[in-house]
């Protein structure tokens, strides 16, 4: 693992420098914190030993659930080109093109970006996520974060949100990171383009933070705010305290 150096700030660790065992330990520790459980006896000493070592494992990107490469390709294209397009994710140009984009994403085939309007690609991605990505964030984490926002528990929010990037599988972490980059691109140019950023978060809140069966009445505004805060989280580095 690789730690960033800043004598005036808590030690930060690059997630991509972790080996498989370290990533699993981090995920377990973050889950324990989210669930309000203490780490097992001896785990702190074990973790601190990990922090002091460099790991040479190269297999940390093994995935538990895959996401088609065509999805990431489309997200990269949207990120690069959405800065001057109004109503991205909100309205399409062609329903037929949207349907074709969804099919291509499902078949893991690349979209011909030169032949399709960006709004149709974005809408295709939105529908693909709605239909195919139902467990981006684990059920137990969704329950806990909805409870925290429903009761406006500030301490619980601060515990859960920054740890979510490290309890999801790597494909979903990369998906959320790509989504964050898209939103940043749209937000930076929202005023000039008259974009309703809040509506985009309102659309994706229920898609990313899926309502558990016993929480179907959760207000969409709660899910929107969770996503807004999650998109401010650091997906690349985490403090060493997350291990404890």
Swiss-Prot record:
Domain of life: Eukaryota
CDD domains, per the entry: RhoGAP
A Pfam entry, by short name: RhoGAP
Gene3D superfamilies hit by this protein: Rho GTPase activation protein
Chain ranges passing through the membrane: none
GO BP term, example: signal transduction
Protein name: Uncharacterized protein ECU09_1400
């Amino acid at each position: 693992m690789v730690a960033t150096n800043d004598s005036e700030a808590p030690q930060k660790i690059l997630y991509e420098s972790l080996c498989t065992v370290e990533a699993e330990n981090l995920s377990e520790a973050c889950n324990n914190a989210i669930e309000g459980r203490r780490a097992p006896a001896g785990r702190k000493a074990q973790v601190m030993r990990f922090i002091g070592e460099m790991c040479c494992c190269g297999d940390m990107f093994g995935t538990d659930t895959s996401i088609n490469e065509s999805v990431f390709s489309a997200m990269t294209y949207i990120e690069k080109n959405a800065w001057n397009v109004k109503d991205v994710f909100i309205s399409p140009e062609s329903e037929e093109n949207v349907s074709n984009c969804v099919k291509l994403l499902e078949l893991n085939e690349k979209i011909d970006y030169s032949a399709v309007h960006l709004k149709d690609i974005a809408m295709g991605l939105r529908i693909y996520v709605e239909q195919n990505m139902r467990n981006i964030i684990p059920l137990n984490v969704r329950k806990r974060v909805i409870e925290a926002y429903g009761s406006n528990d500030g301490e619980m929010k601060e515990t859960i949100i920054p740890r979510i990037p490290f309890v999801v599988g790597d494909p979903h972490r990369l998906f959320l990171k790509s989504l964050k980059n898209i939103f940043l691109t749209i937000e930076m140019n929202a005023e000039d383009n008259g974009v309703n950023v809040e509506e985009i978060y309102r659309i994706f809140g229920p898609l990313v933070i899926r309502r558990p069966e016993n929480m179907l009445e959760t207000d969409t505004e709660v899910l929107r705010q969770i996503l807004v805060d999650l998109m401010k989280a650091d997906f690349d580095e985490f403090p060493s305290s997350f291990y404890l």
